């Protein structure tokens, strides 16, 4: 079942609550919709230096990756575990979910290119650059001036690039199992 996409600027009401531009794009499991903040795409280019149509495609595919996790029951399982553990473990599980969504975005790019030959020269680099731009370390460094790895909820730039690339190169769901990986 495909998710519905909701485009917004500024703020939006979802089944998960009210969200402003500071949240950026997100997936709401309660209504199974992907919410895409159009202001974020300008920020991706202007603040993080990640531009191009494939940078935007990566972000959308990442959020749809969360919908895939919902369809597979992964989001629900992780949410149950997170309700029973402390913040450090919650954050670690969140990073695993986010990196898996990055991998699923790479898997989508692999399959789309294989079936439709859609990638142009430079597209993969745009996606990798976007993955790097939204790493917790880069965001923390730019907003706080320092990095606190224990506070990561999405993964470092290097991790996000690695998992997006892995999904793209392998192109299989099995390759995206961050929960059993030796190295995130």
PLM segments and residue spans:
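Acidic helix-start/capping segments at beta-turn-to-alpha-helix junctions
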Residues: 1-17, 83-85, 122-128
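Post-HEXXH active-site segment of zinc metalloproteases
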Residues: 70-98
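Pan-zinc metallopeptidase signature
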Residues: 132-184
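Short helix/loop segments within enzyme catalytic domains
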Residues: 1, 89-92, 96-139
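Short pre-active-site segment immediately N-terminal to the catalytic Zn-binding motif
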Residues: 40-59, 89-95
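Active-site recognition of the HExxH zinc-binding catalytic motif
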Residues: 36, 55-71, 102, 106
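A mature extracytoplasmic/lumenal domain signature
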Residues: 9, 38-40, 72-73
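Catalytic zinc-binding patch centered on the HExxH motif and its immediate surroundings
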Residues: 10-37
């Amino acid at each position: 079942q495909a998710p519905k996409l909701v485009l917004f600027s500024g703020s939006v009401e979802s089944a998960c609550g009210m969200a402003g531009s500071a949240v950026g794009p997100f997936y709401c499991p309660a209504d199974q919709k992907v919410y895409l903040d159009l202001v974020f795409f300008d920020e991706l280019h202007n603040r993080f230096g990640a531009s191009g149509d494939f940078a935007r495609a990566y972000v959308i595919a990442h959020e749809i990756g969360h919908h895939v996790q919902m369809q597979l029951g992964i989001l629900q399982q992780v949410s149950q575990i997170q309700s029973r553990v402390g913040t450090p473990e919650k954050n670690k599980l969140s990073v695993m979910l986010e990196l898996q969504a990055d991998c699923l975005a790479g898997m989508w790019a692999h399959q789309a290119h294989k079936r439709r030959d859609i990638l142009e020269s430079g597209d993969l680099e745009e996606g990798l650059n976007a993955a790097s731009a939204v790493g917790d370390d880069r965001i923390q460094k730019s907003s706080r001036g320092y990095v606190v790895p224990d506070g990561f909820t999405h993964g470092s730039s290097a991790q996000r690039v690695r998992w997006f690339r892995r999904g793209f190169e392998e192109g299989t769901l099995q390759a995206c199992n961050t929960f059993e990986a030796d190295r995130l």
